[in-house]
Each structure stands twice: as structure tokens, then as C-alpha cells.
Amino acid sequence: TKISNEPLVIPNKGEYIIINSPELKLYSMLKTSLFIIPLTNDLYKVGATYDREDHTVKTTQNAKEEMINKLKAIINCNFEVVGQVAGIRPTTRDRRPFLGTLLECKNKVFFNGLGTRGITSAPSLAKSLYNYIENDLELPKEMNIKRYYKW
């Protein structure tokens, strides 16, 4: 067996903004066309964008405007953009994370490719990976890194 020639991880640039909004009063994460995560002191993380072509970590005005427009469609209160962050997230071709061990490296465990849904799926995926390692329970086929093997 050998691992497929396709790349396991595909870089995907994402940007988010940080807003100040004393009026918002959100106490838990909201996920719609954007995520809104309460931080502290009326600050919120809002995002994110997707860009498979640009692999820089430079913020862009286009991404900022896109998020502001989407945010205005979701909330009905004033806010001020106080920061913007860009980074590269790991994604996979089939948009599924990969978890588990390679056949030849049982002592190396993978937990990657979560992409944009990672923020909401990481807790349950971590539980699945824990049960795989500690309790010998199988990982779901669609998330098992072994799906990349050619038999």
C-alpha cells in the first residue's frame, strides 16, 4: 500500500475581523454565513473568508468589506472594526478532516484538515480520536486518514 499522490492538505487562506460592539451582547458563538465569537470587553471575532489562490497572510480590503456586509445582514446594532487577521487553514480535497495514524507510523497521530468547520467540529472529532487511541474504536471512514491509501 502507498499513500495517494494527491496532497493531504490544501492551503486555504482565511481572514477574520475583530469588532467592538457594546450593543451586541452575544454570550456564545453564533454560526451562520459567518461565525461570531464573543471575546471580552465587547470584542467579537467575526469571519471568515476563503481564498484558495492567495497563500499570503496579508489582510485585504476586499475580505474586510465582504465580512462587514455579511455582518450587517445578520446583526442590527452598531459595531466598529478594530482589527483584522489573515492566516492559512489546512483543508482537504473532499472537505473532510483526517484523523488517525498512518499504517507505517503508529506512533504519529494526525488531527488536521479541519478547515473552516474546525471551530464547531473539533470537540467531537477530538473525542473520536481519543476513543480511537485509547479504546481501539474505529474512526468514521470519511475522516480516517487511511482513506488516502491506494490499496
Language model: regions and residue ranges:
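Active-site substrate-recognition segment that forms the wall
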Residues: T1-K106
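C-terminal catalytic lobe of FAD-dependent flavoproteins
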Residues: F79-W151
